[in-house]
Amino acid sequence: MDIDALSLNELKALRSKVDRAIVTYEERKKKEAFAELDEIARKMGYPLAEILTMVETKPRKTVAAKYANPANPSETWTGRGRKPKWVEAALASGKSLEDLTI
């Protein structure tokens, strides 16, 4: 297939077909992998679901708060993620993050 000779619409249609083929291929391979794992687990006398529950997930590390609301010290922020409304309000009123540091 000479893709250089294809029009833009033909190239887009081809890309769409390739994208679908990739998704289908990956799904098929995942199902095959699952079937193999299930067979191995059954040969050893265990249901795969039971074995999968043994997979350890790392506990999320808690991050210490860096900033506190001067008006309500129980409201804190680690400095990660979206700024809480009280931080945005403090910054809008002219305070800096250093003013909110714990």
From Swiss-Prot:
InterPro entries in the cross-refs: H-NS_C_dom, H-NS_C_dom_sf
Entries under Pfam families matching the protein: Histone_HNS
Annotation: DNA-binding region: 80-85
Induction: Expressed in light-grown cells, probably a member of the senC-regA-hvrA operon.
Annotated GO CC locations: cytosol; nucleoid; protein-DNA complex
Location relative to the cell: Cytoplasm, Nucleoid
Gene Ontology terms, MF aspect: bent DNA binding; DNA-binding transcription repressor activity; minor groove of adenine-thymine-rich DNA binding; transcription cis-regulatory region binding
Subunit structure: Homodimer that oligomerizes on DNA into higher-order complexes that form bridges between disparate regions of DNA compacting it.
Similarity remark: Belongs to the histone-like protein H-NS family.
Protein's name in the database: Trans-acting regulatory protein HvrA
